[in-house]
Amino acid sequence: MAGSNIKVQIEKQLSERILLIDGGMGTMIQGYKFEEEDYRGERFNKWHCDLKGNNDLLVLSQPQIIRDIHEAYLEAGADILETNTFNATTIAMADYDMESLSEEINFEAAKLAREVADKWTEKTPNKPRYVAGVLGPTNRTCSISPDVNDPGFRNVSFDELVEAYSESTRALIRGGSDLILIETIFDTLNAKACSFAVESVFEELDITLPVMISGTITDASGRTLSGQTTEAFYNALRHVKPISFGLNCALGPDELREYVSDLSRISECYVSAHPNAGLPNAFGEYDLSPEDMAEHVAEWASSGFLNLIGGCCGTTPEHIRQMALVVEGVKPRQLPELPVACRLSGLEPLTIEKDSLFINVGERTNVTGSARFKRLIKEELYDEALSVAQEQVENGAQIIDINMDEGMLDAEACMVRFLNLCASEPEISKVPVMVDSSKWEVIEAGLKCIQGKGIVNSISLKEGKEKFVHQAKLIRRYGAAVIVMAFDEVGQADTRERKIEICTNAYNILVDEVGFPPEDIIFDPNIFAVATGIDEHNNYAVDFIEAVGDIKRTLPHAMISGGVSNVSFSFRGNNYVREAIHAVFLYHCFKNGMDMGIVNAGQLEIYDNVPEDLREAVEDVVLNRRDDSTERLLDIATEYLERAVGKVEDKSALEWRDWPVEKRLEHSLVKGITEFIVEDTEEARINAEKPIEVIEGPLMDGMNVVGDLFGEGKMFLPQVVKSARVMKQAVAHLEPFINASKEVGATNGKILLATVKGDVHDIGKNIVGVVLQCNNYEIIDLGVMVSCETILKVAKEENVDIIGLSGLITPSLDEMVHVAKEMERQGFDLPLLIGGATTSKAHTAVKIEQNYSQPVVYVNNASRAVGVCTSLLSDELKPSFVEKLDIDYERVREQHSRKQPRTKPVTLEVARANKVAIDWASYTPPVPLKPGVHIFDNFDVSTLRNYIDWTPFFMTWSLVGKYPKILDHEEVGEEAKRLFKDANDLLDRVEKEGLLKARGMCALFPASSVGDDIEVYTDESRTKVAKVLHNLRQQTEKPKGFNYCLSDYIAPKESGKNDWIGGFAVTGGIGERELADEYKANGDDYNAIMIQAVADRLAEAFAEYLHEKVRKEIWGYSPNETLSNDDLIREKYQGIRPAPGYPACPEHTEKGALWELMNVEESIGMSLTSSYAMWPGASVSGMYFSHPDSRYFAIAQIQQDQAESYADRKGWNMLEAEKWLGPNLN
């Protein structure tokens, strides 16, 4: 049957049901207990070496046995037979000196399976059976040295593998295979050689069969034998465009589940799995029964992971029969629609999407650009050369560029040697490789050494179209992305126009003629040196920057790269100025859309850190703003060559320093003083018999005082956090001594805390962790955006006593339900704590607690956490605590079930009929003074401080009261003053040292309302819709008011009035996460939380400032507005700025529309998680409405008819609608 027809037929089957692959062939053969003579048969009875164990040979010596096994699997329900050719390549057959029989074995195996499959298809024509020609991994590995003393050695080459696989593929096709199955991949480079061979044979024979790919995760590390993660492995072979991608062997279904789940999420094609029947026992046997295995398969299928299922080692026809029973009628996994992205990999994946931040390509492993690296390669000091690569990765390079083009080097041999050595260093090989050479043979040699998906640097049209197309096709077959230089037969592009012309021509050839994915095309439009003294060179940087923007606009999904250090070449020897030039140049390139650059990752300067006078001079040069810009830069360049800054701090002794060491430690803990904690802790250690006694004695005594004072309300949360910082520093000093003496101190329990997947907010979680640590609980904090799999895996590994989940956005509630279900499925017996801004006792009782049989406790604030944990971990207190909890939850559920809305629900039709009544005929919407997009980069923090609303800041620290009155509060006033001072001191540092960056943008677009939605137009002609913003409407009875919807405040399309809508996104948190992590690493939880709280306030202040500027200057409908900060906080202005995820527009995915409309991530670097949380966490976004009647409102509960209408307008099915509208669905 023709390959294309087979593909269509199989894809139809896969879309309708879960197909079954057969089970273990080796397992069935072992059941016959064959001896040497059985393997030999008559034909090979005089073979010169032992043949026992050569299972593939049985297709020649015992074909009836193989036929019977195939028959048994088809009778059990299998749809796809695998040929008995797992070890039938010439390379594997060499173990038996049978290389010459490889072709025959593959042919006969396919022919035999074909006959059996055709027989069963004839019996049941409505269920066709297919033959998958199997190409196994061979017994050699192309990525790993078999010699521990020589990590660069290989016992098989890429070309040898291609030759062996090509012979097998031809025979499998000739024998009648419907598909080619590349399976049990433990080394992805072997599989890349195999796929290269398969595609070459397809081209040679002018036939294309569907290809199935199946890898092997070898152990609990979640990686292949050669070290790749599931996603990295997928990215490396995605170019094959297989019909299915899957996992098999090594693990049983329990261990393999997590990785099949990952694959089902990332794979654009169908997903297969054929696990082992559990893990082998002490005798090498597999114990998982068909019924038990089918139970796992049923759960996988119902979870939506599967399109094909089968078995590997230890499985039998009975296993397949039971699987067939449990998947019958279960809907197969639906293919996901994934965003267009360049998906690269080393040992780990690197996905570059439209909204990704700038990608740094390390440049120092290049003999033409690094004298040190060239010397090391020339002297064959490869170990030291590897350290150069590792330094680049450690300094932030996400890709490393490797170039060996030097006249006195054998570039091809050096490239192969170095890449093979890199493969043995996980800290280097975790990132993708850019194979860089001007010689095609060197590029090909490099591509044959990298198992991940790398990048070729580079090809061009310099030698004509024919050669360009030939090389591009091979690069695609090797599975790499490509950099295309702006170079053709005329020469290098040095003007903006030539750059566009060449890149456009190359793009059209690659996409339209070669079939190269546009997202894997990276253009290098040539970076040339500026400030050379030659006038013709002055505009080189401007030409590049402008060409970047043109290419990004006109060549969809293509990316831009370049060798950044070229631009500053005329200042070689003055690294300070060169780094300033790089910083300025990159800043402008990135703003225009540049995706990546080849840079020295260890010497990247930050744009804002360049001194203002130098930055201005550099910008004059880069942007060609003045005729004398080169001379002005030269004048001040020398001044910066050896600039240095020093700082001395004085310490002063205090009276309490004369106290006994135990009291000094207590004083430091209570007062939060870190200055002397290490020396006092050391003194206490010397006085103690064992170092652990210092923790269990004076330090815990001091923390008990802190806990008592906090419990009595005499200390407040900020002070407790400072105390924890002191404690951490003391413990950090003692840890080496404790470890050396193998002592273990007692704690009250071990608690795992995590912000769930898709959510980036963790201030509350961090505070809870600190409070619990102060009460002698060991805390394992996994941070933010933590997957369910990671939470539960670490919980098991660390043997924790309690798991605590946190989240701020509403989609996190569903993720918490998922975690609870998984804990129940996996048999956890730990209490589960639930907390975060969107959580509630009602949601916990109704949605979470009923999915998990162990205690699930809603913790509404940090002060309650200690009491809850104490009760849950106490044998005496737990029974009564849980009993009261159960009674309370039952009461909450009853209240929820009886709860009636304050007003009755109405139909959507009725609600729409009661929309806000606005007389549009007598109202003219204001036209913006400055329409379009406005970007505020590195905005002045001092301006934002004037717009801070401090009341929520104190609430973060559990100090309740309104600012400024809280500063004079009888109980908390003194602590509020200290906290306020610390925050402002930190803000002073933020301003002075640039610790945080604030970035923001707003945009004003022509718009009209169409029913409940808002059409946003590309321009003032209003002929093309750029985006539709979808809205919900209040859906309860409103006898004296309206059923509000945000679209009511935009002029209807039919009114003929030209209205406008605004959008904005701001962050005050660029750098906040890194700072917080740095403070945490130094044991300073107080400042870690403080920087987060301050960043949050700056983000909200930025939103307030920008809205005012829009009203007064940009939109300009309130030019004479004069409001105090208090007036602004009280919203006494005209217009509103509702935010997706909040009451007036509670559905979070509308942020995605806003991001696309304004190009937020490209413009200012803010991104969205899978749950539509904003990153950085200290961010605000929303829409601007100008109508004087516009007001805030809450949607509350909606009915089924509105959910269906909303789903239809969004293009969702109802499952998707229920997921995102859940909190509002009645």
UniProtKB/Swiss-Prot annotation:
Residues of the Hcy-binding domain: 7-327
Cofactor descriptive note: Binds 1 zinc ion per subunit.
InterPro entries linked to this entry: Cbl-bd_cap, Cobalamin-bd, Cobalamin-bd_sf, Dihydropteroate_synth-like_sf, HCY_dom, HCY_dom_sf, Met_Synthase/Corrinoid, Met_synthase_B12-bd
Keywords: Amino-acid biosynthesis, Cobalamin, Cobalt, Metal-binding, Methionine biosynthesis, Methyltransferase, Repeat, S-adenosyl-L-methionine, Transferase, Zinc
Record-listed S-adenosyl-L-methionine binding positions: D949, R1137, Y1192, F1193
Ribonucleoprotein listed as a keyword: no
SMART domains documented for this protein: B12-binding_2
Protein residues bound to methylcob(III)alamin: E696, G758, D759, V760, H761, D762, S806, T810, A862
Domain Pterin-binding: 358-619
Gene Ontology biological process: homocysteine metabolic process; methylation; tetrahydrofolate metabolic process
Disulfide links within the chain: none
Residue stretches making up the B12-binding domain: 748-883
Sequence ranges assigned to domain B12-binding N-terminal in this UniProt record: 652-746
Gene Ontology cellular-component annotations: cytosol
Cofactors required: methylcob(III)alamin; Zn(2+)
Residue numbers binding Zn(2+): C249, C312, C313
EC id: 2.1.1.13
Catalytic activity field: (6S)-5-methyl-5,6,7,8-tetrahydrofolate + L-homocysteine = (6S)-5,6,7,8-tetrahydrofolate + L-methionine
Family: Belongs to the vitamin-B12 dependent methionine synthase family.
Function as written in the Swiss-Prot or TrEMBL entry: Catalyzes the transfer of a methyl group from methyl-cobalamin to homocysteine, yielding enzyme-bound cob(I)alamin and methionine. Subsequently, remethylates the cofactor using methyltetrahydrofolate.
Domain notes: Modular enzyme with four functionally distinct domains. The isolated Hcy-binding domain catalyzes methyl transfer from free methylcobalamin to homocysteine. The Hcy-binding domain in association with the pterin-binding domain catalyzes the methylation of cob(I)alamin by methyltetrahydrofolate and the methylation of homocysteine. The B12-binding domain binds the cofactor. The AdoMet activation domain binds S-adenosyl-L-methionine. Under aerobic conditions cob(I)alamin can be converted to inactive cob(II)alamin.
Additional remarks: L-homocysteine is bound via the zinc atom.
Descriptive protein name: Methionine synthase
Organism: Aliivibrio fischeri (strain ATCC 700601 / ES114)
Organism phylogeny: Bacteria, Pseudomonadati, Pseudomonadota, Gammaproteobacteria, Vibrionales
